[in-house]
């Protein structure tokens, strides 16, 4: 579901605290999230560089909102599930905790060991096999678990 022009304008107005038609570039991630997008930290840093100024206007927000590389949580969920399914040759719906830890700390928008430790406190790891349901993991991440890279 896309945000309407009115919703984008309303969002911009909320972040434009002094009504000067400008919003701090530091708020770009929060703006996009409030409009239903889910930019990664890397996305946000790239957008800040692209904007190239300390502030942005409504037209910049509209342009950025339309970018296809800024995913919704549902799009991110599908992509993550597809990636885990590709790794799951046996089709069990699980990944070993040690393998997951390795992936999360070394690939893509990787996480710190401390962030992975926090995540592991939130997910269920089978005490017998050490396996993690990747569907449950993805739901935890997409539902708003505050990880820097996601």
Swiss-Prot record:
> Could you say which residues bind Ca(2+) here?
16, 18, 20, 22, 27
What positions does the domain EF-hand occupy? 3-38, 75-110
Q: Subunit composition?
A: Myosin is a hexamer of 2 heavy chains and 4 light chains (two regulatory light chains and two essential light chains).
Q: Which UniProt keywords apply?
A: Calcium, Metal-binding, Motor protein, Myosin, Repeat
Q: Name one Pfam family in it.
A: EF-hand_7
GO molecular-function annotation terms? calcium ion binding; cytoskeletal motor activator activity; microfilament motor activity; myosin heavy chain binding
The protein's matches in PROSITE patterns, at most eight in alphabetical order, are given as:
EF_HAND_1 (PS00018), EF_HAND_2 (PS50222)
* UniProt xrefs under Gene3D superfamilies: EF-hand
Can you supply a Gene Ontology BP term from the record?
A: myosin filament assembly
Q: What is the lineage of its organism?
A: Eukaryota, Amoebozoa, Evosea, Eumycetozoa, Dictyostelia
Originating species: Dictyostelium discoideum
Q: Which GO terms describe its cellular component?
A: actomyosin; extracellular matrix; myosin II complex
Entry protein name: Myosin, essential light chain
Which InterPro entries does the entry mention?
CALM/Myosin/TropC-like, EF-hand-dom_pair, EF_Hand_1_Ca_BS, EF_hand_dom
């Amino acid at each position: 579901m896309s945000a309407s022009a009115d919703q984008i304008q309303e969002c911009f107005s909320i972040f434009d605290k002094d009504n000067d038609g400008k919003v701090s570039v530091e708020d770009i991630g929060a703006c996009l999230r409030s409009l239903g997008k889910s930019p990664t930290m890397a996305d946000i840093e790239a957008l800040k560089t692209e904007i190239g100024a300390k502030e942005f206007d409504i037209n910049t927000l509209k342009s950025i909102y339309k970018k296809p590389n800024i995913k919704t949580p549902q799009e991110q969920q599908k992509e993550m599930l597809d990636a885990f399914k590709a790794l799951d040759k046996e089709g069990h719906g699980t990944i070993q905790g040690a393998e997951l830890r390795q992936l999360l700390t070394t690939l893509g928008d990787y996480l710190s060991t401390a962030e992975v430790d926090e995540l592991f406190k939130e997910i269920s790891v089978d005490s017998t096999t050490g396996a993690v349901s990747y569907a449950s993991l993805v739901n935890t991440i997409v539902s708003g678990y505050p990880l820097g890279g996601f």
